[in-house]
Curated annotation (Swiss-Prot):
This protein's name: Translation initiation factor IF-3
Coiled-coil intervals, chain numbering: none
UniProt keyword annotations, A-Z: Cytoplasm, Initiation factor, Protein biosynthesis
Molecular function terms, GO-annotated: ribosome binding; translation initiation factor activity
Gene3D superfamilies reported for this sequence: Translation initiation factor 3 (IF-3), C-terminal domain (3.30.110.10), Translation initiation factor 3 (IF-3), N-terminal domain (3.10.20.80)
Region (Disordered): 179-217
Length: 217
């Protein structure tokens, strides 16, 4: 029997960035940290300039002739690149419609579970379809189902707003919630907000009878 093939379990080699001493090209076109051109200089001279600035020499265009390097704070540059990548990934998230199903006679524990599910969906930027399922003659209790859905909307009002009010859909009653774009300001917070004080100017004192008589004399 031929030997079984072995799988290479070694961790993949992580590609290191081409910065500072890892740059091997003898001649480089260097851009300074302020964007000015330092021209084509030797690798050693470029490293010395970066060292004087207490910055890094980073290879930004290896295919150019000669290769182009820039003097910069590589740690800060890497942080900004990762931040941009996260923002781009967040923007590329396609909104989905997630569904939360329940019965109109749901108990408190199961209701809390459905609330937790809805919160997770909303935080992920997805819309939530809240569905109350009727079986048999339960269809006559649409009023109770609507009350339940509006209760759910109220409990989630800090994170969601109603996109579509409760309505019948076949043998079910549904409601759509969408993530709230602006934070909700509660009524109590509005009432507690300090009002801008209005400066009042006191009226001048009225002259006494004695003072009036003295002025007429």
């Amino acid at each position: 029997m031929p030997p079984r093939p072995r799988f290479d379990r070694r961790a993949p080699v992580r590609e290191l960035p081409n910065i500072n001493d890892r740059i091997s090209y003898p001649q480089l076109r260097v851009v300074d940290s302020d964007g000015s051109q330092l021209g084509v200089i030797s690798r050693e001279e470029a490293l010395e300039v970066a060292k004087e600035r207490e910055l890094d020499l980073v290879l930004v265009s290896e295919k150019a002739d000669p290769p182009v390097c820039r003097i910069m704070d590589y740690g800060k540059f890497k942080f900004e690149q990762e931040k941009k990548a996260k923002e781009a990934k967040k923007k590329s998230h396609q909104t989905e419609v997630k569904e939360v199903k329940m019965r109109y006679k749901i108990d408190q524990h199961d209701y809390d579970v459905r609330i937790g599910q809805a919160v997770r969906f909303l935080k992920a930027g997805d819309k939530v379809k809240c569905t109350v399922i009727f079986r048999g003659r339960e269809i006559q209790h649409t009023a109770l189902a609507e009350t339940l859905l509006r209760r759910m909307a109220k409990d989630l009002e800090e994170k969601a707003e109603i996109q579509q009010a409760p309505k019948r859909e076949g043998r079910n009653m549904i409601m759509f919630l969408t993530p709230r774009k602006t934070p909700l300001v509660k009524k109590e917070e509005k009432e507690a907000a300090p009002t801008k004080a209005v400066r009042t100017i006191p009226a001048p004192p009225r002259p006494t009878a004695a003072k009036v008589a003295a002025q007429q004399a």
